[in-house]
Amino acid sequence: MGTGFKGNSKYYRSIGQNVMVTSSKYRYVNGRFGESSPHGDQSTRHIVSSDNLATAKDFYDKIAYGGIEQKYGSNMRITRMADGTIITMRVVSHTDGTPVVDINIIDSTNPGGVKKQKIHFVQGDGK
């Protein structure tokens, strides 16, 4: 575990402070990123990309900027934001093997409109 805030932010940030920059690059509608997954409910999402791992890392770095990150081996990173939101990135998900970012707002004091969701980054002809 390093010291300071993710991305060398000078301040401990909440998820709501990162929505605008993240949503300028990734589809964001009604508190959810990406598209509805054909195999899940509204909280299971997917973003299609020609380089799904690089896209997942970019998304995670933007949405978790300014949080406190802990690394767990080579597969998982967990970031706690100032508002209590927990953002987890796994390089390989347990369900389908794709990279996944989980946004958990259960303990958030101010999620800034973001809803609880799990986003799978799927290899394809996306951006």
Report residues per predicted region:
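Solvent-exposed loop/turn segments at secondary-structure junctions
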Residues: S93-D96, D107
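Amphipathic, interaction-prone secondary-structure segments
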Residues: Y72-H94
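Low-complexity, glycine/serine/proline-rich disordered segments
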Residues: M1-K71, I103-K127
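Histidine-centered divalent-metal-coordination microenvironment in nucleic-acid enzymes
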Residues: M76, G97-N104
